[in-house]
Amino acid sequence: EPYRRQRQMCIRDSFQLDSFDKGDYNKAVEQENLARNLVEVLYPNDNHIQGKELRLKQQYFFVSASVQRALARYKKHHDDIHKLPEKVTFQLNDTHPTVTVAELMRILLDEEGLSWDEAWEITTKTCAYTNHTIMAEALEKWPIEIFSRLLPRIYQIVEEINRRFILQIQAEFPGDNGKVARMAIVYDGQVKMAHLAIAAGYSVNGVAKLHTEILKNEQLHDFYELFPQKFNNKTNGITQRRFLMHGDPLLSLIHISEPTRP
């Protein structure tokens, strides 16, 4: 029977016994406490710098763990990393896991030894993006200073993706500097995660017909002009009757069958 796994990512034990034996009890648990902060409470208030940094650390921790786990499972059964898109899709549900794009590129480049073009071809066939909002202010952005300081290698990769993406925009819309400014992934001191997801994803979907039309014609119109083939609608939600029929047909029969009479 088909089923879904839900994984719980945890930190390694980072208790420093040497520091404890020397009487430095605070230092002994310092790293453990810092690491535990990543998984204790998700989505901290990001109105201050500490909250922003913790949120980005959390996002990268869960993304990296998930991507590494997926690739390890793939390589356990398959030898050719180039065929990854035939077996794996990373669904970027809103912008929070969008750093997946750069993390996958990092692994393919630095650990698998692929060229940029090879890694990018695999990544763009493996990642798909779901947008949940038409409000521009809700599309996640990170200050370059924080992003580059906490994730230096990831930022290097994002910069190169941005450089190549800008060249693609300029080739398609020559002389339109306004479009470059609106679509760039790294611009005006910010790393724009939705732009990264659209540039790298093979699919960009809204969650209702009207929502998707607004994305195509208004909010993400520049991207729709460049990538019309990527945009599609996937209506969010499912009725409880359909869910039960598909999820547990035998149980559904109990609910729809005629009641027995004495």
Predicted regions and their residues:
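Residues forming anionic-ligand binding surfaces in small-molecule and nucleic-acid pockets
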Residues: 30-50
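Segments forming glycine/polar-rich beta-alpha architectures that bind adenosine-containing cofactors
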Residues: 205-253
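Gly/Pro-rich turn-and-neighbor structural signature
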Residues: 4-8, 12, 18, 44-202, ...
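Compact, glycine/acidic-enriched structural inserts
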Residues: 20-27, 32
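Catalytic alpha/beta active-site cores
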Residues: 24, 36-40, 105
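Single conserved hydrophobic/aromatic residue that forms the stacking wall/gate
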Residues: 1-7, 11, 254-262
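Short, well-ordered coil loops that connect the C-terminus of an alpha-helix to the N-terminus
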Residues: 114, 228-229, 262
